[in-house]
C-alpha cells in the first residue's frame, strides 16, 4: 500500500534532448496536455474552490471522554480558528440531540455503566425510584440520563459515529454492540470512515537542506535510551522486551508503576530530548495502532524511536523507513542493544535517522478537539450518502 506520509518529487536536471527528438517531444506534450485537460474536466470541484461556504453542521458529543467525576465541562473548540474547518456547531448539551446531524459516542464511556444511550437502540436508565444507591460518574450524570429518557426516536438522517482510540486489546464490550447501530467509525485505523491518527507527517512548505532543528544538538543528549510507561504490566510484550534489553544497555524508565521515576506530562518532551533513543513501545500490537509514543514522545522530542507495535510494513505506511528502528529488525534484544551502542559511537550514522526532517514535519493530533471537528467536516463532505456498520467488532478486531 502506498505510504501516507508522501515522498519528495524527483530532482530536475539532466542532459538536453537531441534536436531530432524535439518534434516528438512537442507532440507528446500536446497529447498529454489534452489528456490531462480531459481528466481534469471530469474531476469534481475541489472543496476550497467553491465560492459558497459549507452548510452548518451540528455535532453532539454524547459523553465527554475522560471528563472525570468533578471536572466541569470544557467548552467546544472553535473549529475554524483551530483547524480551519468552518460551519461547525458543536454541542455537549443533550438537549441538542434532535437537531444534531451527527452524534459522537466514545467507546470507553459507551460500554461502562450506567447505560444511557439515546432511544430507541440504547438501554435507558432505570426509573428514579429504582436508582437509589446508584453511583453516578459525576453530579450531572443522573440529569443527563433523565434528558436521554425524554428524547424522541432517532432523527431522520442523523449519523451515529463510534469513536475509539484504544486498541482492540483494551476495548471491552465490542461484542455487545449490535450491528447497524452506528453509521460511521472514527479511529486511528486507516480504514475508518473518519481516519484520525495520533499524528502524521506533512511536507514542509519550504524544504531546505538544513531547516531549524533538523538534528538536535548531540551535546545535549546526555542519556542513551529513555522509556516513559504509564501502565506497568509484566504480562505485556513491551515489559518483557524491556527486561531483556535492559540486561545489555541502560534504559532510564519514567512514569507510573514498575521501576519508573515520576515524570509530569508537561516535562515529558523536554526530558526525552536529552536522550538519543526512545522506546516507543505500544501496550498491544494491532493494525495501525501507532500512538503518541511515536509522534510526540519520540519525534517531537528529537529522539530516534525504537518501536514495538505492528510490523515494520505497517509503520512504513505512515513514516519513512529510515525514521525509526523496529525491534523486529533484530534477532534478539542483545543484537538491538549492540546496534544502539554502535549508533552512539558513530554520530554520522545516527544523524541519518533525522534526514526525513528536511522535507517533512510532525503533526500531533489534538485530543479531543480535533476528532470532533473532523467529524463535522466529514458530515459536510458526505452530503446525503448513507451507510451503516454491520459488524463493528468483526471489523475492529481483525
From Swiss-Prot:
GO terms for molecular function: 4-galactosyl-N-acetylglucosaminide 3-alpha-L-fucosyltransferase activity; alpha-(1->3)-fucosyltransferase activity. Pathway: Protein modification; protein glycosylation. Its main location: Golgi. Residues 41-398 are lumenal. Glycans are attached at residues 84, 183, 311. Its EC number is 2.4.1.152. It comes from the Eukaryota. GO terms for biological process: fucosylation; glycosphingolipid biosynthetic process; inflammatory response; Lewis x epitope biosynthetic process; lymphocyte migration into lymph node; oligosaccharide metabolic process; positive regulation of leukocyte tethering or rolling; positive regulation of neutrophil migration. It catalyses: a beta-D-galactosyl-(1->4)-N-acetyl-beta-D-glucosaminyl derivative + GDP-beta-L-fucose = a beta-D-galactosyl-(1->4)-[alpha-L-fucosyl-(1->3)]-N-acetyl-beta-D-glucosaminyl derivative + GDP + H(+); an N-acetyl-alpha-neuraminyl-(2->3)-beta-D-galactosyl-(1->4)-N-acetyl-beta-D-glucosaminyl derivative + GDP-beta-L-fucose = an alpha-Neu5Ac-(2->3)-beta-D-Gal-(1->4)-[alpha-L-Fuc-(1->3)]-beta-D-GlcNAc derivative + GDP + H(+); an alpha-Neu5Ac-(2->3)-beta-D-Gal-(1->4)-beta-D-GlcNAc-(1->3)-beta-D-Gal-(1->4)-beta-D-GlcNAc derivative + GDP-beta-L-fucose = an alpha-Neu5Ac-(2->3)-beta-D-Gal-(1->4)-beta-D-GlcNAc-(1->3)-beta-D-Gal-(1->4)-[alpha-L-Fuc-(1->3)]-beta-D-GlcNAc derivative + GDP + H(+); an alpha-Neu5Ac-(2->3)-beta-D-Gal-(1->4)-beta-D-GlcNAc6S derivative + GDP-beta-L-fucose = an alpha-Neu5Ac-(2->3)-beta-D-Gal-(1->4)-[alpha-L-Fuc-(1->3)]-beta-D-GlcNAc6S derivative + GDP + H(+). Belongs to the glycosyltransferase 10 family. This is Alpha-(1,3)-fucosyltransferase 4. It comes from Bos taurus. The gene is FUT4.
